[in-house]
Curated annotation (Swiss-Prot):
Belongs to the globin family. Keywords: Cytoplasm, Heme, Iron, Metal-binding, Muscle protein, Oxidoreductase, Oxygen transport, Phosphoprotein, Transport. It catalyses: Fe(III)-heme b-[protein] + nitric oxide + H2O = Fe(II)-heme b-[protein] + nitrite + 2 H(+); H2O2 + AH2 = A + 2 H2O. Nitrite binds at residue 65. It comes from the Eukaryota. Monomeric heme protein which primary function is to store oxygen and facilitate its diffusion within muscle tissues. Reversibly binds oxygen through a pentacoordinated heme iron and enables its timely and efficient release as needed during periods of heightened demand. Depending on the oxidative conditions of tissues and cells, and in addition to its ability to bind oxygen, it also has a nitrite reductase activity whereby it regulates the production of bioactive nitric oxide. Some amides were assigned by electrophoretic mobility or by homology. One of its GO terms (biological process) is removal of superoxide radicals. It comes from Lepilemur mustelinus (Weasel sportive lemur). Heme b binds at residue 94. Its EC number is 1.7.-.-, 1.11.1.-. InterPro entries: Globin, Globin-like_sf, Myoglobin. O2 binds at residue 65. This is Myoglobin.
Length: 154
């Protein structure tokens, strides 16, 4: 299930574009997640009051959280699958404190792919999309394994 060196290179090339505007990308990803899957908003007390995409766009807190999410994910992606140290505390907090179901990680993965494709169509063609989907699936599978170790059935 691992990625080839070439696939990792495709993932990291487009991730460089994300890092140039991590806050903007993160905000768009969360807006896409929350508008496409409103049930996910219930896990975020801080954002529950945001009902429209315009309200979400105006929220500095949402942008900050988007930055946090994509910065953490970028750190994991740069490990090219060797992300045990980064993944463990993330799985712990998402399983025990936030109680985020794996399904929601699938939803945000889809949102990430959509946002990257809409913002960077030239750099995020079919091969790069397939590589990113594979990298995000690897991340989710590893989180799911940690959830199981923690006794969380997310």
């Amino acid at each position: 299930m691992g990625l080839s060196d070439g696939e990792w290179q495709l993932v990291l090339n487009v991730w460089g574009k994300v890092e140039a505007d991590v806050g903007g990308h993160g905000q768009e990803v969360l807006i896409r997640l929350f508008t496409g899957h409103p049930e996910t908003l219930e896990k975020f007390d801080k954002f529950k009051h945001l009902k429209t995409a315009d309200e979400m766009k105006a929220s500095e807190d949402l942008k900050k959280h988007g930055t946090t999410v994509l910065t953490a994910l970028g750190g994991i992606l740069k490990k090219k699958g060797q992300h045990e140290a980064e993944l463990k505390p993330l799985a712990q907090s998402h399983a025990t404190k936030h109680k985020i179901p794996i399904k929601y990680l699938e939803f945000i993965s889809d949102a990430i792919v959509h946002v990257l494709h809409s913002k960077h169509p030239a750099e995020f063609g079919a091969d790069a999309q397939a590589a990113m989907k594979k990298a995000l699936e690897l991340f989710r599978n590893d989180i799911a394994a940690k959830y199981k170790e923690l006794g969380f059935q997310g």
